[in-house]
Amino acid sequence: MWLSNHWKDYELIDCGRGERLERWGDQILVRPDPQAIWNTPRTNRGWKVNNGRYARSNTGGGQWQNKSMPERWTINYGNLVFNIKPMNFKHTGIFPEQAANWDFAMDQIRHAGRPIRVLNLFAYTGAASVACASAGASVCHVDAAKGMVAWAKENAKSSGLENAPIRWIVDDCAKFVEREIRRGKQYDAIIMDPPSYGRGPTGEVWKLEENLYPFVELVSGVLSDNPLFIIMNTYTTGLAPSAVTYIMETVISKKFGGHTESQELGLPVTQTGLALPCGVTTRWTASSQSSLHSVSR
């Protein structure tokens, strides 16, 4: 497991009974988490006294209750600054477990010894884009949601990177990659967080289990002749990490060599000293030693 254990402004205080108790800066929140299936005692007072709890409804969706948190605030991760805005579907704007991947990407870029061009697909609010730019990379940030790209720009500005070489693209990721291939554009690193399920711009259905292999084949076409790394997140519980490794090995390693590794991402739980699993990340690197820079459990 790759642990995101360098946070100061975020803390997973406790988890269990399908929820997590978290500190975001000075705000205490309770949010649903399907992985927290254990029925452990709730001794921390934050379970009862907090700034907001997201409660699921019986008909789907849900809402924030007992809200005393502001509409937005910022938290820091090192020199990165992120704007937190609790949304209608439990999310806050960043996934703190991804910090392990930000650290990995920044380390790869800083040790590359050459300019690195990063393509960030399904890039959401741009935490990875901002992290890579802070390490000196030029970044192409792509997401189909205009609001998410605007939020990502805010994060870049808050981090003092409003003038960094980041291209902000609102587009369907597959269509954009197809056009980049036709243009002859190439990238040294790719980060992608494809959804489990979705619909394309003309209504076509995306299912991760069915579309992941051809999508990896597609993005391999924009890699440079000297690629540095690929990070791919998969949150689909039915997709085994070894299956994703197999895809990366047969598509990327077959073409470029290198090394592929898949592990769970995790957040340390203060109350128990254990770790909450938060999905799977697959990393391909040109060097078999590259993943050793990460913190593992």
Model feature map: region roles:
Residues 6-22, 29-96, 103:
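Non-catalytic substrate-recognition/targeting regions of SAM-dependent transferases
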Residues 115-124:
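Conserved class I S-adenosyl-L-methionine
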Residues 125-137:
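Conserved SAM-binding loop of SAM-dependent methyltransferases across substrates and taxa
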Residues 138-143:
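Conserved SAM-binding motif I beta-strand of class I
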Residues 145-191:
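S-adenosyl-L-methionine
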Residues 146-148, 170-174, 187-218:
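Mobile active-site "lid"/loop adjacent to the S-adenosyl-L-methionine
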Residues 223-225:
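Helix-to-beta-strand junctions that scaffold the AdoMet/dcAdoMet cofactor pocket
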Residues 227-297:
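C-terminal catalytic and target-recognition region of SAM-dependent MTase-like enzymes
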